[in-house]
């Protein structure tokens, strides 16, 4: 296989684009702000292809299973893992923010805060986040509506039903199975084309962020940001690193393997932007297609570790900054509410702040107006959230695959140790043939 030069690799191109975006936004803020359509356009192209890929991957994965009980088993194990690890993330954020206490001494007066920028978030949060609303929201009004609006959980729900129905058809369902499998190849080919524009999207998104908010806004609440970034690093390398070690892989090698996806997320602040490539990478790593198809899409609502850390830290920070005392009962109440509201967040920019607003609305102890304190820097913390979310969902997929004995451990070792050509993480990875499955 011909070795690419360093400047031909996607990770180098994206990293360079991010650097130019930061420079443009800093020195020419108005021009940088005008670059926003570039980032928005790239994310829209990715979102355009996400739901068809999820549908095809989940349908072929389920229809290819010989044992239909496996679907429920994989889903159950995934949800068990999601709940345990995301709750651990909430707890870690709670412990760190109470140890460092970055909000103590700010003495912010909520009556004097500018809350105009909160209107959009509080209005969205007010639409309802009850458990019943969440469950009903998973069921689409129509299949076309779910695809048109890009509702991942709704598409996942329909794909599971369709896959089960296709499997029940037996031999009669094989032609449809093969057709959907070929369509999936075509969609991944589209992703391969879209990823050529990743550097442009990362450049536009970063130029806009720096141009609009400025590097100066990073220093005003730097202690909170520093605490959050530190907690995310500890979570990834200590918690996920330990989980990875128990499953037979090194977290540093895993992160190196998905470096291109991480850089795309860094540039766009949305873990969804790397979803198609992440699914292909995990299949290439040795995880079965059926497990990848179920775990990754579900994880984008149930396993957002970075968002979980952010939610507890931001909530307690606002309480500290506004001199709102929290006793043990109130703190545990916040943790309990966040265990529910955090499951409704999506892996898109700004969703964490909407979830936080919904949580504050459910907990009258903390003033909603206090959110104005962190509105200005929320955009800068979204990168760490998205990166942690991506790594967390990747690790979750490997773990569930290992639990199900659906992980090719030997291949994973070869890929992570760069003993296979595919481990280079090149763009043509998305065009590879999937593992063989029986229809």
Swiss-Prot record:
Q: Which Pfam families match?
A: SDF (PF00375)
This entry carries the following GO cellular component terms, namely:
plasma membrane
Could you tell me the superkingdom of the organism this chain comes from? Bacteria
Q: How does it sit in the membrane?
A: Multi-pass membrane protein
- Major location category of this protein: membrane
PROSITE patterns named in the record: NA_DICARBOXYL_SYMP_1, NA_DICARBOXYL_SYMP_2
Report the record's Gene Ontology biological process terms: L-aspartate transmembrane transport
Keywords from UniProt, A to Z, are:
Cell inner membrane, Cell membrane, Membrane, Symport, Transmembrane, Transmembrane helix, Transport
**Which InterPro entries does the annotation name?**
C4_dicarb_transport, Na-dicarboxylate_symporter, Na-dicarboxylate_symporter_CS, Na:dicarbo_symporter_sf
Q: Which GO terms describe its molecular function?
A: fumarate transmembrane transporter activity; malate:proton symporter activity; succinate transmembrane transporter activity
Q: Does the keyword Signal apply?
A: no
Which PANTHER family did the record assign? AEROBIC C4-DICARBOXYLATE TRANSPORT PROTEIN (PTHR42865:SF1), PROTON/GLUTAMATE-ASPARTATE SYMPORTER (PTHR42865)
Q: Which NCBIfam families match?
A: PRK01663.1, PRK13027.1
Q: What name appears for this protein in its UniProt entry? A: C4-dicarboxylate transport protein
């Amino acid at each position: 296989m011909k070795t690419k030069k360093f400047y031909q690799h996607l990770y180098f191109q994206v990293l360079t684009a991010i650097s130019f975006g930061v420079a443009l936004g800093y020195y020419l803020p108005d021009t940088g702000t005008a670059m926003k359509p570039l980032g928005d356009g790239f994310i829209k192209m990715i979102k355009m292809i996400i739901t068809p890929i999820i549908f095809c991957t989940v349908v072929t994965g389920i229809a290819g299973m010989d044992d239909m009980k496996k679907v429920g088993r994989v889903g159950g194990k995934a949800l068990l893992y999601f709940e345990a690890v995301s709750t651990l993330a909430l707890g870690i954020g709670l412990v760190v923010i109470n140890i460092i206490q970055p909000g103590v001494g700010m003495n912010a007066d909520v009556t004097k805060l500018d809350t105009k920028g909160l209107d959009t978030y509080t209005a969205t949060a007010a639409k309802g986040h009850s458990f019943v609303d969440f469950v009903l929201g998973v069921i689409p009004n129509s299949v076309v509506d779910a695809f048109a609006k890009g509702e991942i959980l709704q598409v996942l729900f329909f794909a599971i039903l369709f896959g089960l129905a296709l499997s029940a058809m037996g031999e009669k369902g094989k032609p449809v199975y093969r057709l959907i499998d070929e369509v999936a190849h075509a969609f991944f080919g589209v992703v391969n084309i879209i990823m050529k524009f990743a550097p442009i999207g990362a450049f536009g998104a970063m130029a806009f962020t720096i141009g609009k908010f400025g590097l100066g806004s990073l220093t005003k609440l730097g202690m909170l940001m520093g605490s959050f970034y530190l907690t995310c690093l500890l979570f990834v390398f200590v918690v996920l690193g330990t989980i990875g070690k128990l499953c037979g892989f090194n977290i540093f090698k895993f992160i190196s393997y998905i470096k291109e996806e991480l850089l795309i997320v860094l540039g766009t602040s949305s873990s969804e932007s790397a979803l198609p490539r992440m699914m292909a990478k995990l299949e290439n790593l040795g995880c079965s297609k059926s497990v990848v198809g179920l775990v990754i899409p579900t994880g984008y609502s149930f396993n957002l570790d970075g968002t979980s850390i952010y939610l507890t830290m931001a909530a307690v920070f606002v309480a500290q900054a506004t001199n709102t005392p929290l006793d043990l009962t109130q703190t545990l109440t916040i943790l309990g509410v966040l265990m529910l509201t955090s499951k409704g967040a999506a892996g898109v920019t700004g969703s964490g702040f909407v979830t936080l607003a919904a949580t504050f609305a459910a907990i009258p102890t903390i003033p909603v107006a206090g959110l104005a304190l962190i509105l200005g820097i929320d955009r800068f913390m979204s990168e760490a959230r998205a990166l942690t979310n991506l790594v967390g969902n990747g690790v979750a997929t490997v773990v569930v695959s290992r639990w199900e004995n659906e992980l090719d451990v030997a291949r994973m070792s070869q890929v992570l140790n760069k003993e296979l050509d595919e481990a280079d993480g090149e763009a043509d990875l998305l065009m590879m043939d999937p593992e063989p499955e029986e229809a």
